[in-house]
Swiss-Prot record:
Swiss-Prot/TrEMBL GO biological process terms: queuosine biosynthetic process; tRNA modification
Annotated GO MF terms: preQ1 synthase activity
Function recorded in the entry: Catalyzes the NADPH-dependent reduction of 7-cyano-7-deazaguanine (preQ0) to 7-aminomethyl-7-deazaguanine (preQ1).
Source organism: Caulobacter sp. (strain K31)
EC number: 1.7.1.13
Pfam families: QueF
UniProt protein name: NADPH-dependent 7-cyano-7-deazaguanine reductase
Keyword hit for Metal-binding: no
Binding site for substrate: 71-73, 90-91
Subcellular localization(s) per the UniProt record: Cytoplasm
Entry's family note: Belongs to the GTP cyclohydrolase I family. QueF type 1 subfamily.
Reactions performed catalytically: 7-aminomethyl-7-carbaguanine + 2 NADP(+) = 7-cyano-7-deazaguanine + 2 NADPH + 3 H(+)
Group of enzyme by EC: oxidoreductase
Main subcellular location: cytoplasm
Amino acid sequence: MTELHVTQLGQVVEPAASPDQAVLERVPNPQSDVTYLARFVAPEFTSLCPVTGQPDFAHLVIDYAPGDWLIESKSLKLYLTSFRSHGSFHEDCTVKIGRKIVEIAQPRWLRIGGYWYPRGGIPIDVFWQTGPAPEGLWVPDQGVAPYRGRG
């Protein structure tokens, strides 16, 4: 078995106070010769409005085609949790998460959908990806319906 160089998996770890202090970790991809899609879903993501300090809520869907590295899922959970006390606009949170994953894991491709619940009566959906999906990659729909409220 490949030795893993991770600091959080299997340990009791307190979430970082901010995303900039959080540690996102990677592990070797044993299937790096295959192009495939991995998906993380965070249906209860929270952050703070940078102006009012009120909580914001989102359903995040992160799709990526790993290269040589995988995102270690406990570190991702802790990284996402670090946004709970972080004030940032929806667009910034969504793109920041995608860019951090790209920085650490260097995937073949990544897209993130941030489906934010309404604040001020307006739901905001934010989408970012690194470019076209690799040829032949099966990319299923993210499965999150547009916000309809009671309509």
